[in-house]
Curated annotation (Swiss-Prot):
Pfam families to which the protein is assigned, alphabetical: ABC_membrane, ABC_tran
Species annotation: Pseudoalteromonas atlantica (strain T6c / ATCC BAA-1087)
Entry EC number(s): 7.5.2.6
Free-text function comment from the UniProt entry: Involved in lipopolysaccharide (LPS) biosynthesis. Translocates lipid A-core from the inner to the outer leaflet of the inner membrane. Transmembrane domains (TMD) form a pore in the inner membrane and the ATP-binding domain (NBD) is responsible for energy generation.
Name of the protein: ATP-dependent lipid A-core flippase
InterPro entries on file: AAA+_ATPase (IPR003593), ABC1_TM_dom (IPR011527), ABC1_TM_sf (IPR036640), ABC_transporter-like_ATP-bd (IPR003439), ABC_transporter-like_CS (IPR017871), ABC_transpr_lipidA (IPR011917), P-loop_NTPase (IPR027417), Type_1_exporter (IPR039421)
Transmembrane intervals: 23-43, 64-84, 140-160, 163-183, 247-267, 273-293
SUPFAM superfamilies the UniProt entry points to: ABC transporter transmembrane region (SSF90123), P-loop containing nucleoside triphosphate hydrolases (SSF52540)
Compartments, as annotated in UniProt: Cell inner membrane
Broad EC category: translocase
Domain of life: Bacteria
Amino acid sequence: MTHTLPTQNVFKRFAVYLKDFKLAFGVAIIGMVGYSLIDAYVISLLQPIIDGNGGKWDYDYLRIAAYFVIPVFIARGIFNFMGTYTLSWISSQVVMKMREQLFHQYMHLPVEFHDHHPSGQLISKVIYDTEQVAGAAGKAFLTLVREGALVFGLLFWMFYHSWQLSLVFILIGPLVAMIVSVVSKRFRLVSKNIQQAMGNLTSSAEQIIKGHKVVLMFGGQDLEASRFAKKNNNNRQQNMKLVIAQILSVSSIQVIASVALAVVLYISSKPNFITDLTPGTFVTVVVAMTMLLKPLKQLTTVNSEFQKGMAACVSIFSVLDNAIEKDTGSKVLDKAKGKLEFRDVTFHYPNKEEAALSDMSFTVEPGKTFALVGRSGSGKSTISSLLTRFYDAQQGTILLDDVPLQDFKLKDLRRQFALVSQHVTLFNDTIANNIAYGSEGRVTPEQVLAAAKTAHALEFIEQLPNGMETLIGENGLMLSGGQRQRLAIARAVLLDAPVLILDEATSALDTESERLIQDALETLQQDRTSIVVAHRLSTIESADQILVIERGRILEQGDHASLLSEDGAYAQLHKLQFGDGQTDA
């Protein structure tokens, strides 16, 4: 995901986000320029006040100024509000749009992408990187226009009053430009490192929060604290590098500006060199030059904000540029019959040499139960991932109702499968909404209740204080493993898909929970094609066909009785689980 785009190209792409806010930008620019020009104009009033009427105080001028100063500063405040509020509004809109784009992209990127990128870093892009973009769109642009307008306004009055003295200040321009160019590259590099460090920090915190029970059980507090401290210190160091670069650049430019000011003062001390300067003109020019130091400092500082924003844009664009899931199918499918077929399927996971599946071929007739048995890592779960097209096979063809999976629209294809896994995913929402997930707007509360009853979930739901409206916490942390599993089954019941995938659905459950869930699964499997991935052979004895897999290849295939009679790999697995005396079960 590494991009090395030039700043100009990144800014052009970023500018696309701003094109919808042309009117707002116009208002903001008017506000910021008006604010700065008032400041510059106030400085220009020093000359007539000091020089007065032939060197005497002009009391009429002072009286007019007294009436004039309040409206001027009211106008200054209005201009400031126009510029600051409008730019803040624009930056918030840009951040919102970028976050929505990232979120949408995350949902449509292939599973392979999420396999290779820590969730903490992806979250950091949504939360932290977009805020850096806001800094570029808001604070940086505000400072650039407002302080830039002030610089031009002050230079205008300086040249108007004494172009000879003002010319000295212009000579520092190339030096300032050179410093800004060098420092910009440093800002960009350090900003990129800060974003990477922030992503690592977020990942570390997320891991500990999710796995805090494991940390407590194994006494890993000191280890994790040390790891986090190291990453936290790295983040601090990167931020300090940015601060150092910022301080050095600001100080360098201010020193150069002070040299120019010193030259002006020295020239002014030579009466024969400049003879037409009045005291008021001299004071106005010197004060304007002194006031230039602050906007020059701000313009140098804003460079760091801008470079942080551009580095964040590169980070965000690197995600947005990833290809989303390929959905090349055109066939619409309402409800499949449920026939599945693998024809000479070979599949490699990315960056792995050994095939997860090799020349895999089998057929599952509609309404039949097909069980997959084998050691961990043999390729059982890979089959279910290929059926739902989380991955695509490199060789061979997978068919649903005699049609290759790639020919169907992805959304229609996945609607044909209901997955119940040992790794249940629930959301921080009500029980009813979790059961109805994916079916919202298409089901009634009565149907949700019926699904819960079929899954034997009502037994515990009715005991909760708010029943179906009970909030269950992140990933159902308020529920037991068996309760979470039953909600997953209820979700599958409500989906009413023609093909059911059960991936270790009853593993690691107590006997009572397993009995209830097994009853619910038997009801769910009726009139559906079922793919059952199991370690517990007792759960698949009634399967129509059992496939024994080893290292991605089919070792044996048949029903429970025939495989036992062959006394092969399946029979050996059965003996390990039940003992020699129960091989006829």
